[in-house]
């Protein structure tokens, strides 16, 4: 596979054309910063979230799951610092009314207060809180103010003692959660990379102070290995350590895994040592004791340190599409038909695992293909396509990342065999129908991206 640059325009076009992602409320002109996931997009998103969930809660015995409410007591966000500090610096153009994050403007524009779009005068910089504020109940005053959560982590912290008591958890242990978060971003851009409504995959790992550096390094290795496991090209990944000017006030250390998107290297996931800041703050604001009692060490009491892994699910979806996307020349005849667009998804995250394709609609081939599809349905997400030349049908499946195609032809009726085609190599093998499921499972287990 060639390593070449792709444009975001091509990614957006493919996503809309093939039903991965649509602009929200498109018939009304679209809602800025909001996107809908189509039939293939939701399958891909669900597969990515399942892969992450398995990695955390199934393969680690000391991590359990949680699904906390989106609406939380407003004191939660006072304790976390979001009410006071969750802000971005905002400037407006007095002429064209465009809005910008001041820290994202070229220094000369900010210094001279010149709009980069129209040359108009910019306003003074002011703080803009990113939390969506609403009201709960029948009144509309300060007593009914509530927020849409800007992150999922706080739901884990406020349930930390509940989970210790109900599940008899002992440190070190983790709590994993996948859920929606909302941020009133000044500027939403780059398709689904930065949006107002998004999903996070977060795991908070509670450790004894003094062991935090060891666990921090452990989770750095684990999270990098996750992307390797699902076929992401490591030359497209890099670590970025937060400098003193980037490090959050509560963090002891923080690293981002960055991926080279079409717009450059951008954050994909963060691994953070949050110390005991969050639990200490919730102790202060709630009046509840958040100390851990270590019964294995003479009932020693301490507030745990927290190692956080925080990834954007929707951002991961974009990354997997970008990383899988390729345009390949498949023949040397010098015309456009000899190129194919292909998505090299790992089979475990591909929206469709197997497509069943009858060579012809007639002579009972379609009925036989439907029988075979019904057998495969119990094990895999399948598709069925009987329209057009077989070569064009292969191309359609390549374009959405289907790793395996099963072709049913006239020989299938005679000897009960089928052709199994592999997306990446385009090679084909003839196998007995009775061995099809086992062969596909073996291919998935042994899959290595070329």
Report residues per predicted region.
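NTP/phosphate- and nucleic-acid-binding module
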Residues: 1-450
């Amino acid at each position: 596979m060639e390593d070449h640059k792709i444009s975001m325009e091509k990614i957006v076009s493919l996503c809309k054309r093939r039903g991965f992602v649509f602009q929200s409320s498109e018939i009304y002109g679209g809602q800025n910063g909001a996107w809908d996931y189509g039939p293939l997009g939701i399958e891909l998103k669900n597969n990515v979230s399942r892969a992450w969930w398995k990695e955390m809660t199934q393969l680690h015995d000391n991590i359990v799951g949680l699904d906390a409410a989106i609406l939380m007591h407003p004191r939660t966000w006072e304790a976390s610092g979001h009410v006071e500090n969750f802000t971005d610096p905002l400037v407006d153009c007095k002429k064209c009314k465009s809005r910008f994050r001041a820290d994202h403007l070229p220094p000369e524009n900010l210094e001279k207060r010149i709009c980069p779009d129209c040359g108009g005068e910019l306003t003074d910089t002011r703080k803009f809180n990113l939390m969506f504020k609403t009201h709960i109940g029948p009144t509309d005053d300060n007593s009914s103010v509530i927020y849409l959560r800007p992150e999922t982590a706080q739901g884990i912290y406020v349930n930390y003692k509940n989970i210790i008591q109900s599940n008899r958890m002992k440190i070190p242990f983790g709590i994993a959660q996948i859920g929606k978060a909302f941020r009133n971003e000044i500027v939403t851009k780059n398709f689904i990379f930065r949006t107002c409504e998004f999903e996070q995959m977060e795991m908070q790992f509670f450790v004894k102070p003094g062991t935090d550096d060891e666990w921090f390094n452990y989770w750095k290795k684990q999270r990098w290995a996750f992307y390797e496991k699902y076929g992401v090209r490591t030359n497209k990944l890099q670590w970025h350590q937060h400098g003193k000017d980037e490090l959050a006030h509560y963090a002891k250390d923080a690293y981002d895994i960055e991926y080279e998107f079409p717009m450059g290297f951008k954050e994909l996931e963060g691994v953070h040592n949050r110390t005991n800041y969050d639990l200490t703050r919730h102790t202060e604001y709630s009046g509840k004791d958040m100390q851990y009692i270590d019964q294995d060490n003479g009932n020693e009491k301490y507030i745990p340190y927290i190692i956080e892994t925080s990834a954007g699910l929707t951002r991961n979806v974009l990354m997997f599409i970008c990383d899988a996307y390729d345009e390949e020349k498949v023949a040397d005849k010098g015309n456009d038909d000899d190129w194919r667009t292909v998505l090299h998804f790992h089979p475990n995250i591909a929206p469709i695992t197997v497509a069943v394709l009858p060579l012809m609609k007639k002579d009972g081939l379609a009925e036989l293909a439907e029988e075979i599809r019904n057998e495969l349905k119990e094990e895999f997400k399948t598709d069925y396509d009987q329209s057009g030349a077989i070569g064009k049908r292969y191309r359609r499946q390549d374009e959405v990342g289907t790793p395996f195609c099963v072709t049913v032809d006239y020989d299938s009726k005679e000897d009960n065999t089928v052709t199994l085609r592999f997306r990446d190599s385009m090679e084909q093998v003839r196998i007995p129908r009775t061995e099809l499921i086992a062969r596909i499972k073996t291919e998935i287990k042994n899959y290595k991206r070329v």
